[in-house]
């Protein structure tokens, strides 16, 4: 009987030793160059880097189709029988998901790993993410209508692998709400128990406005006007109400407020060639309109 106790104690001790060895082994073999808990500010910078929606596919597909459909330009090779056929997905749509991937991770980290005042420091930063995605998604839904948005890129956080497609009407409702919330958030101090919480400084991590939250407020508020323009012929009263509310806050009204996306010092144009001559020539409707209104362009 005594021998059984000795053997049992030996086995328990061995298991504990092996378990601790495994834990130590896992710690030792963790690659120090891999970031397991990224800084939310850096995720925001990556979202900005992924934001560029006016790249090759935008010019080659989205704008190529849009300009001809709106009779702004005419194809230099003549209109083909497939002129109205969409055979590819848009650039804006693919870019919004590249941005969304970073935004969802940023939001998850702030909401689940930070608490109290430390979490509150990122309130403005989280608010900036909505207008980034909305700007790109607004272009995409103009072209293609419904798109996966509210449930997209949520699988790793317990969401679905088959997100639903939100209709344009549903998206406009959502974006109106989100943009209003963003503007109101950026227009007011963040407080806890009556004490102001200083917001996380972005500085050079913000390649658009260098951490100037006031300019981000103007950008988000101006997007509300773009949304109102899309609604004016569908629901005029609603569009005007959006404009009236937006008028309570500042908008982009000068060159210093421009959302200037400085892509790089060298690759400033469409990859594969800087010439856009093959995209089409000015249509009769456009040229005549410009002449009648003395447009010098």
Question: Locations of the language-model features?
Answer:
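TPR/TPR-like alpha-solenoid repeats
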Residues: 136, 143, 227-228, 234
